[in-house]
Amino acid sequence: MGATLLIMAAGMGSRYGGNKQVDGLGPNGEILMEYSIYDAIRAGFDKVVFVIKPGMKETLASICGDRIAKKVKVDYAFQDFSSVPSFYHIPEERTKPFGTVHAVLVARDYIDQPFAVINADDYYGVSAFSTIYEKLQTLAPEGEATMVGYQLQNTVSKNGTVSRGVCHAVNGNLDKVVETLKIKLCENGEIRDIGAGEPGELLDPLAPVSMNFWGFTPWIFGKLEEYLATFLKGLAPDAIKAECLLPVFVDELMHEGELTVPMLTTDAVWFGVTYKEDKPFVQAELRKLHESGVYPASLHE
């Protein structure tokens, strides 16, 4: 049995200051998601679905989509307001789509097998893809999902605060996800949640966090649809930036007793570009991976 890789690439990248999904960061101009796709294919994934903004397809196809389509099946799903339930009136001031729950849901018509979900602008590491691929092969058809957890200390930025789903596990299963929106790496090395102001709550640097690397079966789409509808019905008219987030959805489904989530651990290194200032570090790390033989000289060959 194969598996599909769903890549969420429709985010605006407001903190980064540009469209980071298609910013060339590798030594040959490779974009970050090309590394994830390369790792996924060698792990066994046989299909890629890009979730993108309308208007991005031609650019993404020319950068990497057409080349990848020679190796695995490729589809494009659009995250825009046309997929929002008809009962919801979209405020004129709203420009952003409705978050990661919405992003996964718009890919529904393109997925009929177990699938992994990732962000386009994160580097997840080679072993993480083989680990989740193996787990996807044994997921129960209904009521079970999985996720790859990363150490909090390996996912913060020196250049500003980050948002992370801080996880707690019991007997290997995810028990709680706390979506923490303003995590700061302090000058003294401490990591704090400053969402309610500084100095903020001290966080465990070894705590596992969600980087939106999830594994699901198609059963989840019905639950996503119900959850998004409930979210929109409860949304205030002036909440023009509110997002429906995947970690919060998973947390609620777990506590309703509808979902069990075995948490996978990995020694893979994560890095990403939340801010433009993160770019030189990411470029240097990718260069090292090529030079050490983790990747060939070019992913474009």
Language model region names:
Residues L60-C64, I132, L224, V282:
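Hydrophobic packing residues within well-ordered alpha-helices of enzyme cores
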Residues M1-I7, P27-V117, Y124-G125, F129, ...:
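Conserved N-terminal catalytic core of the sugar/cofactor nucleotidyltransferase
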Residues G215, V261-L264, G272:
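Conserved active-site beta-strand element of glycosyltransferases/polysaccharide synthases
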Residues A3-G17:
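A phosphate-binding catalytic loop at a beta-strand-loop-alpha-helix junction
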Residues V22, V166-V170, M263:
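A structural signal for short hydrophobic beta-strand segments in well-ordered beta-sheet cores
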Residues V126-W214, P218:
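Conserved core of the sugar-phosphate nucleotidyltransferase
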Residues E225-L259:
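A C-terminal functional module that forms or caps the active site or interfaces directly
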